Structure formats: structure tokens, C-alpha cells
Design a protein with these regions (language model features):
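Leu/Val/Ala/Ile-rich N-terminal alpha-helices, chiefly Sec-type signal peptides and the beginnings
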Residues: 2-46
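Proline-rich intrinsically disordered, low-complexity coils
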Residues: 28, 57, 147, 227-228, ...
């Protein structure tokens, strides 16, 4: 499979995006398709958000330091230092419960992007966006091992980044829900994710090392990240519907 350069990509590939999203909706665990959609539709997004980052004092300092977050987020000794109740401790628990890892996302992204390790500001910003995805799961309360949780965070991310690929995935998931029993609850939860992303502070300018020391609930308040109430309601409705189904017995 040919790799794609995020630096050279300037046009959107709608055909490729439709193929990838069809595969993704059939198998929400196929993370490779997410990166294909981003490569197809997010042309110029990293450059635009990098310019926004360096336009702020704190963002300029982060860009100047150019820390590779994957090296921090895969360092067990570094993660072990954070006290219970902090963002860092919550992220550590997230990794333990899900079995996910930052270097797992890194490996998948390198299957698609030829320049993910390139020493270029836009490529660095793209890597940073990749590496903070699971941190945003922790901050927002949208579960990563749940298809609806991913869709809600994707909608949140679209509001934060304006990356068309994120919006395309969220919209596709919402349209698919029209054929599902709990479809209305799913669509409301996705809309809530987008609304929360718009209302929250711009998270890209957060210093992750400082954020990880902060108590999780205090960080949510400071960043104006509201509780995912409609998402929780949709989860409960799905669980209730599942438990009310008659059990099938073997013939």
C-alpha cells in the first residue's frame, strides 16, 4: 500500500473517503480507515491549526519545544508519577482498562502517512493531534471501546479542529443510525459531542505535561467540558433494550 504525504496532500479524495467510511462503519475497530479518511479530507487542517497554535503565547511555547507526545505517553515510569484523581492518573487507568497505547496509534498512522516522522512543523502538529486523541477521551468522558463514544468524540474533534474528515465520520455515523432502533438517541448524543466541542476551550494549546498534574474534574471545569449526559442516556437506552430482548434457547 502506498503511503501518503500529509505535507503534499492539497486536494480532497471523496471517493477514497466514502470507501473508507463504509469499511469503518462496518467495523468500528478498523482504525486504519480513520487515518485514510483524515488523509483524504483533512488537507490543510494541520497547517491551519498549527498557525492558530503559534498565534497564542502558550501555544507558541509548545510549538517551540516540539515535544513528541508519544515518547511521554508510552513511558510507564513517567505515567506512574501522577497522583490519583489527576488527568494523568485517569489516562493511565484508561490505558490499563482498554489495552490501548499511543504507540499503537503511531504504528497505524505510519501505514498511511509517509511523513509522520518528518521534522516539519505541520507533520509534528499532525502527530500531536494523533497522540492527544485518547487524552480527549479521558477529558470528555466518551468511551473509546464503544462505537458511539468514538462517534461523539469525533464530533467533538470536528468542532475543535474543523477537520472535514472528522465531520464526515460523525455525519456518516449519524445517517447510519436512522436504520437503528436507538437511532434518535445516537443522533442526539453525536450532536451533543459537537456542541461540547464548540463550547470547550481550544484544547490544542493545552500543555499536556501541566494538564496531567491537574485534577480531572477541575480540568474539565477550567476547559468548559460539560458532562456527556445525552451520551450516557443513549448508552443506558441501548443497555435496557438489550436486556429486555427475550433470551434465545438452543433447539
Amino acid at each position: 500500500m502506498a503511503a501518503i504525504s500529509v505535507l503534499a496532500k492539497t486536494k480532497r479524495d471523496w471517493r477514497g473517503a466514502f470507501r473508507a467510511v463504509k469499511t469503518l462503519l462496518a467495523d468500528p475497530d478498523d482504525t486504519v480507515q480513520v487515518f485514510r479518511i483524515m488523509a483524504a479530507l483533512n488537507a490543510g487542517t494541520s497547517a491551519k491549526n498549527y498557525r492558530r497554535l503559534i498565534s497564542t503565547p502558550e501555544g507558541g511555547r509548545i510549538a517551540y519545544a516540539r515535544v513528541e507526545l508519544v515518547s511521554k505517553l508510552t513511558d510507564g515510569a513517567w505515567l506512574s508519577q501522577f497522583a490519583p484523581g489527576t488527568v494523568g492518573a485517569a489516562y493511565r487507568t484508561f490505558l490499563e482498562k482498554t489495552g490501548y497505547s499511543a504507540d499503537g496509534l503511531e504504528a497505524v498512522s505510519k501505514e498511511i502517512h509517509s511523513d509522520r516522522g518528518e521534522e516539519h512543523p505541520y507533520a509534528w502538529f499532525g502527530r500531536r493531534e494523533r497522540d492527544i486523541h485518547d487524552i480527549w477521551h479521558v477529558l470528555t468522558g466518551y468511551r473509546a471501546n464503544d462505537p458511539l463514544g468514538e462517534l461523539c468524540l469525533v464530533a467533538f474533534t470536528y468542532a475543535q479542529t474543523k477537520g472535514l474528515g472528522w465531520g464526515f465520520i460523525a455525519l456518516s455515523g449519524a445517517l447510519k443510525s436512522f436504520g437503528e432502533p436507538q437511532g434518535r438517541a445516537v443522533r442526539r448524543a453525536i450532536r451533543e459531542g459537537y456542541a461540547h466541542g464548540r463550547a470547550a476551550h481550544w484544547l490544542h494549546k493545552e500543555d499536556i505535561e501541566k494538564l496531567f498534574v491537574e485534577p480531572l474534574e477541575a480540568a474539565r471545569v477550567r476547559l468548559n467540558i460539560a458532562p456527556p449526559l445525552l451520551y450516557r442516556q443513549a448508552q443506558q437506552a441501548a443497555q435496557s433494550a438489550l436486556s429486555s430482548e427475550p433470551a434465545t434457547s438452543a433447539a
